[in-house]
């Protein structure tokens, strides 16, 4: 690659003499993503420019993991890494260009998703996950905006910066992965030994988000997230999840019985509810796998999944206006009195007494909005895509990401891992 960054006749910047730089698509903590044209092929690409940092800090280990893993993961439902090269003190990763992502689809109120459309998106997501797990790779950051959609309608898993090889029974991982709303309960309870089941739980949350057109479980803290989970599926018993009480950050919750799953997803088919229940199984050892999910009767029943090329997609960027469905939280969570700590008991609903052990101070957090009592009775009149923003008129909640403490913890772990986590 040439070292110059000269401009062409149109004044467009070149990157490494091959890529014509276009507009910026997004920015993050470690760099920027911009659109570009590959002059060698004529194809539009997306380039992630990652800051390499100071000399002593070395190359960003997260980027190295992503490069290593994506070179091994070649599948129609996984983003393609086309090129990777250092240039002017930065590391550049070149990906195929994808027009939009699943979050944009979910939040666009002009898009009406049929049951066949939802089935198609879930099928493509699970195909990508099944391929990863077959190759012993955990994604660990499943969420709608990491599921990219191309011009042909194909959905592809992207952002493998937190992905890791798994399979060694004694290997420990950090539990501070995934955005909180998509974390499995075993991660919230602090487990450091886990497998592909954590990706399946997150995939279940995405399935639920497609059905509801809003994030399903919106906790404001880890302990509040567990409260949201238990309010939706009931407090797990030891018979359901024997290993739960031995997890490092286990917290005892007051028992709450599970509401009917139909009351949470009134428009979903029986087959969809059955698959959801298997993806949301508490015991990770009993949770359905991605391959088993693909063989579930949900994908064999009518209607058949929509062909990717026929799926609805949002308009180009800049034309969507305010057509986003606000994030709502229609479930009561626990009264949060302090950060998680061992040997405590927390009630799952407002107004109930909370029994605490070794808790020194209290902090209150607001609960989410309540379910509308008559929603199930109206299910026959409600389309598959619900304009919940118009129904409830609630301000959107901020979508969580890894916070600074999580990032610092991850950075320390990465800096101390000389093998980058590629080998067992």
UniProtKB/Swiss-Prot annotation:
Active site positions, chain numbering: 141 (proton acceptor)
Phosphotyrosine modifications at: 30
A cellular-component GO term for this protein: cytoplasm
UniProt catalytic activity: L-seryl-[protein] + ATP = O-phospho-L-seryl-[protein] + ADP + H(+); L-threonyl-[protein] + ATP = O-phospho-L-threonyl-[protein] + ADP + H(+); [DNA-directed RNA polymerase] + ATP = phospho-[DNA-directed RNA polymerase] + ADP + H(+)
Region annotation (Disordered) ranges: 303-337, 359-424
UniProt entry tagged with the keyword Cell cycle: yes
GO molecular function, one term: ATP binding
Residues the record lists as Phosphoserine modifications: 168
Bias (Basic and acidic residues): 359-374
Residue stretches making up the Protein kinase domain: 19-299
Keywords carried by this UniProt record: ATP-binding, Cell cycle, Cell division, Kinase, Nucleotide-binding, Nucleus, Phosphoprotein, Serine/threonine-protein kinase, Transferase
Annotated positions of the Phosphothreonine modification: 29, 174
Binding annotation for ATP: 25-33, 48
EC class name: transferase
Induction annotation: By gibberellic acid (GA3) and submergence in the meristematic zone of internodes. Down-regulated by auxin.
InterPro entries (UniProt xref): CDK, CDK7, Kinase-like_dom_sf, Prot_kinase_dom, Protein_kinase_ATP_BS, Ser/Thr_kinase_AS
Subcellular location: Nucleus
Gene3D superfamilies: Phosphorylase Kinase, domain 1 (3.30.200.20), Transferase(Phosphotransferase) domain 1 (1.10.510.10)
GO biological process: cell division; positive regulation of transcription by RNA polymerase II; regulation of cell cycle
Annotated tissue distribution: Expressed in actively dividing cells of roots, leaves and shoots. Expressed in the intercalary meristem and the elongation zone of internodes.
EC number, as in UniProt: 2.7.11.22, 2.7.11.23
Subunit structure, as described in the record: Interacts with CYCH1-1.
Function, as annotated: CDK-activating kinase that may control G1/S phase progression. May control the rate of cell differentiation to accomplish proper development of organs, or in response to a changing environment. Forms a complex with cyclin CYCH1-1 that phosphorylates CDKA-1 and the C-terminal domain (CTD) of the large subunit of RNA polymerase II.
Protein name, entry field: Cyclin-dependent kinase D-1
Organism expressing this protein natively: Oryza sativa subsp. japonica (Rice)
Lineage start: Eukaryota, Viridiplantae, Streptophyta, Embryophyta, Tracheophyta
Gene name of the encoded protein: CDKD-1
């Amino acid at each position: 690659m040439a070292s110059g960054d000269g401009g062409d006749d149109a004044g467009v910047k070149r990157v490494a003499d091959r890529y014509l730089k276009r507009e910026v698509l997004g920015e993050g903590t470690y760099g920027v993503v911009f659109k570009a044209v590959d002059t060698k092929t004529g194809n539009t690409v997306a380039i992630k420019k990652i800051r390499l940092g100071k000399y002593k800090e070395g190359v960003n280990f997260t980027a190295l993991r992503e490069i290593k893993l994506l070179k091994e993961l070649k599948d129609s439902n996984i983003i393609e890494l086309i090129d990777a090269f250092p240039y002017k003190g930065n590391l550049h990763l070149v990906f195929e260009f994808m027009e939009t992502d699943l979050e944009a689809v979910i939040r666009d109120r002009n898009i009406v998703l049929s049951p066949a459309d939802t089935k198609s998106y879930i099928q493509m997501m699970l195909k990508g996950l099944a391929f990863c797990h077959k190759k012993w790779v955990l994604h660990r950051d499943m969420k709608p905006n990491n599921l990219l959609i191309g011009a042909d309608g194909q959905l592809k898993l992207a952002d493998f910066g937190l992905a890791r090889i798994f399979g060694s029974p004694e290997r420990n991982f950090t539990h501070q992965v995934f955005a909180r709303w998509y974390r499995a309960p075993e991660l919230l309870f602090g487990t450091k030994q886990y497998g592909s089941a954590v990706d399946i739980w997150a995939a279940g949350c995405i399935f639920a988000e497609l059905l509801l057109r809003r994030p399903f479980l919106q906790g404001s803290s880890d302990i509040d997230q567990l409260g949201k989970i238990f309010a939706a599926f009931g407090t797990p018993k030891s018979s359901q999840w024997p290993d739960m009480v031995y997890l490092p950050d286990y917290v005892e919750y007051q028992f709450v019985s599970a509401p009917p799953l139909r009351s949470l997803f009134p428009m979903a088919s029986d087959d969809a509810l059955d698959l959801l229940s298997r993806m949301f199984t508490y015991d990770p050892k009993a949770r359905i796998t991605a391959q088993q999910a693909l063989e579930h009767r949900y994908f064999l029943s009518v209607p058949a999944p929509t062909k990717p090329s026929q799926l609805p997609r949002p308009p180009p960027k800049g034309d969507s206006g305010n057509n986003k469905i606000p994030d709502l939280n229609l479930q009561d969570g626990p009264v949060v009195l302090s950060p998680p700590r061992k040997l405590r008991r927390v009630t799952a609903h407002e107004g109930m007494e909370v029994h605490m052990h070794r808790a020194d101070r209290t902090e209150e957090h607001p609960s989410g909005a309540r379910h509308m009592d008559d929603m199930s009775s109206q299910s026959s009149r409600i389309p598959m895509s619900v304009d919940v923003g118009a129904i409830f008129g609630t301000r959107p909640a901020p979508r969580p990401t890894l916070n600074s403490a999580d990032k610092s913890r991850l950075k320390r772990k990465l800096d101390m891992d000389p093998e980058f986590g590629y080998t067992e």
